Amino acid sequence: MVIQRKYRASRRLGVNLWGRSKDPFNTRNYPPGQHGGMGYKKPSDFGKQFAAHKKFKFYYAINSKQMRNIFLKAYKKRGDTGDNFVGLLESRLSSVLYNSGLVPTIFSARQLISHKHVLVNGKTVNISSYVVKVGDVVTLKEKAKNLPAVVFAVQSQEQKVPDYLEVDTQEKSIRYLRVPKYCEVPYPATMEVNLVIEFYSR
């Protein structure tokens, strides 16, 4: 059900959000539902802002309250709000694990974390929103290294690993090298952080 909802989100937003080869949007590039075949309507300015906000929300698998809190933290920090916002999202444990390519989806990353299969600096962490710091090492526990989802993800190499992560596919370990800026994140779809800022600044 989670995977189905994820794919439905891609079709609703009109984009292959996670860049996966099996995303149904690749073959059914119209909205879901009874009238989906009529195609996508041209959105208003607010509609564009709302859609941009939804893309980030679905991509990182977070809820509206979490998203708003992350934005407020980014807004209060020094520096560029967009870079701060993306940096906070990318520093979440679930994001680091997903971006490493050791798991196939953000949802499988969250599941491994909640089932206590993930270590940060040798200690078990079961909270997806845990903030990984620069220099931290994330590893999978021994019993998780041969899980079908992990083996599939490593073999398929479908995920493009960003250069701010150092990944050892043999040891199933990840070192967080630095907090990325918005322009450094290899999003598979167009992600407009400026529209998210506008959405929350209304």
From Swiss-Prot:
A Pfam cross-reference name: Ribosomal_S4
Gene Ontology cellular component list: small ribosomal subunit
S4 RNA-binding domain span: 91-168
Keyword entries, A-Z: Ribonucleoprotein, Ribosomal protein, RNA-binding, rRNA-binding
Swiss-Prot/TrEMBL GO biological process terms: ribosomal small subunit biogenesis; translation
Cited function: One of the primary rRNA binding proteins, it binds directly to 16S rRNA where it nucleates assembly of the body of the 30S subunit.
Subunit structure of this chain's protein: Part of the 30S ribosomal subunit. Contacts protein S5. The interaction surface between S4 and S5 is involved in control of translational fidelity.
Record's protein name: Small ribosomal subunit protein uS4
Lineage of producing organism: Bacteria, Pseudomonadati, Pseudomonadota, Alphaproteobacteria, Rickettsiales
Gene name as annotated: rpsD
